[in-house]
């Protein structure tokens, strides 16, 4: 049987997700970065390989149980996302002169019979409201909904102003002002493809549920007259029927055809509306002749235009905006600037190293070992394989902090990066010498318990501050590498579509 999941369901999911960041007991989310090593073909301990694409063309992340675990293997660090970093967004549509914009209609997709019997589509060919180009953002960062496009003409006059009434421009377009992107929203929630969407309280308060603004002519009809028999003129006080009250229109005739319909009294409470031919003919100054007109009364969204801009513009997208500032020095310096990253993740409710719910602003996700100053250690290089004598442990260097003699590393399930000669991932431990396989650098772990540069070492070793395999990874993005620097800031905008 035919069925759909409605846009209201999508909107409900988006609202629940957005609210989860700031409700009384919020869900905790972290943005994670990972994958310091290059993409390519990885060898497993059983001699089989896993293909993950190339540096310039990584594969699309898999949504398998295997990948759920793998994504933690090369995680580098994570930063907490707060409610102020979250906003509803919609696809960005800049106003451009010479463009013919679609109009808002309540009946896109619907099959309505008449002189023609086809589904209602937009001028652009879009078959749904939210696929149509019915709103724009101007250079002043004002957002307007297009109510009328002057019979599918090009827009040449950029709308301006913040009036709560319909704005008519010199090109005869009719616009409804919705909201303005604040300076903060422009900085945080405006990208090449998306823009923040909020409901303006003044516009919302002025909205009238079921009030009417537009009537579109589907078929102009013929032989209409005004009183006295003239075939050109205006018939006034034509009632609009339906479930609302008070709607009145005037009808303009040219050579017996209806060429314009203007709402003179908007009325209220309409969820459907009609202008009947009999009411046109019966109007006080009508001539009593004419037939064949088909007029579409455009019904506003629930609450009226501007009552809820987020829903009206299709805000079932949520943007998460996170800024990474160098090493995040003000947050314990958990983000390395000595290596690059190729993977972005969204992690829900992870645990810290102690197994409790994570709450810190940032979390290191790599392992670390404190190297003794004597004998003098060598200089390990990022991305090289490291081995430990005695244990046979294998890892891959993320960063060598020569100032504090801290070696940061990861251990994955693959050869040369975590799997040892027996095919196991063995933990580094004790005072056994660690050797870099490319640099030939050596270092002896300092097995004392201490805190150095905000890193807590127990018997010389520090586990990741973000407990691997805890929480849930909701989003994964593989991308070409992003090189980092201490004086560099990355602004990462994730857009989740519901």
Per-range role (PLM):
Residues 1-209, 294-296, 304, 351-362, ...:
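Tryptophan-rich substrate-binding surfaces of secreted polymer-degrading and adhesive proteins
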Residues 169-498:
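Conserved, function-critical positions that sit in or immediately flank catalytic
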């Amino acid at each position: 049987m035919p069925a759909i999941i409605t846009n209201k369901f999508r909107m409900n999911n988006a609202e629940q997700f957005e609210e989860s960041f700031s409700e009384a007991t919020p869900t905790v989310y972290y943005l994670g970065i990972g994958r310091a090593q290059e993409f390519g073909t990885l060898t497993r301990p059983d001699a089989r390989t896993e293909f993950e694409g190339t540096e310039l063309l990584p594969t699309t992340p898999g949504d398998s149980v295997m990948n759920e675990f793998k994504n933690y293997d090369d995680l580098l660090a994570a930063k907490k996302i707060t409610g102020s970093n979250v906003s509803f967004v919609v696809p960005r549509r800049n106003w451009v002169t010479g463009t013919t914009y679609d109009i808002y209609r309540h009946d896109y997709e619907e099959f309505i019979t008449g002189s023609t019997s086809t589904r209602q589509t937009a001028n652009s060919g879009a078959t749904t409201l939210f696929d149509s180009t019915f709103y724009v953002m101007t250079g002043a960062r004002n957002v307007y909904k297009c109510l009328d496009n002057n019979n599918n003409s090009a827009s040449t006059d950029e709308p301006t102003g913040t009036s709560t009434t319909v704005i008519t421009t010199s090109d005869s377009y009719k616009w409804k002002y919705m909201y303005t992107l604040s300076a903060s929203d422009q900085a945080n929630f405006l990208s090449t493809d998306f823009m923040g969407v909020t409901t303006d309280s003044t516009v919302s308060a002025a909205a009238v549920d079921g009030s009417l603004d537009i009537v579109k002519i589907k078929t102009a009809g013929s032989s209409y007259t005004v009183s006295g028999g003239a075939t050109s003129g205006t018939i006034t006080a034509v009632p609009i029927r339906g479930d609302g009250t008070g709607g009145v229109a005037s009808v303009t005739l040219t050579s017996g055809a209806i060429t314009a319909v203007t709402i003179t009294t908007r009325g209220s409470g309409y969820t459907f509306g009609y202008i009947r031919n009999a009411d046109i003919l019966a109007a006080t100054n009508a001539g009593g002749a004419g037939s064949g007109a088909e007029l579409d009364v455009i019904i506003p969204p629930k609450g009226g235009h501007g009552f809820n801009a987020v829903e009206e513009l299709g805000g079932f997208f949520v943007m998460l905006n996170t800024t990474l500032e160098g090493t995040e020095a003000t947050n314990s310096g958990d983000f390395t600037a000595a290596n690059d990253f190729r993977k972005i993740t969204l992690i829900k409710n992870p645990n810290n190293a102690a197994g409790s719910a994570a709450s810190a602003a940032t979390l290191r996700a790599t392992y670390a070992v404190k190297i003794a100053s004597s004998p003098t250690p060598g200089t390990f290089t990022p991305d090289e394989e490291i081995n430990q004598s005695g244990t046979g442990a294998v890892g891959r260097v993320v960063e060598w902090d020569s100032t504090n003699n801290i070696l940061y590393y990861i251990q994955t399930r693959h050869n040369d990066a975590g799997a040892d000669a027996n095919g196991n991932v063995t933990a580094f431990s004790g005072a056994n010498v660690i050797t870099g396989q490319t640099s030939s650098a050596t270092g002896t772990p300092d097995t004392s318990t201490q805190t150095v540069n905000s890193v807590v070492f127990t018997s010389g070793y520090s586990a990741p501050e973000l407990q691997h395999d805890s929480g849930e990874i909701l989003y994964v993005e593989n991308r070409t590498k992003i090189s980092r620097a201490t004086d560099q800031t990355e602004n990462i905008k994730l857009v989740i579509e519901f």
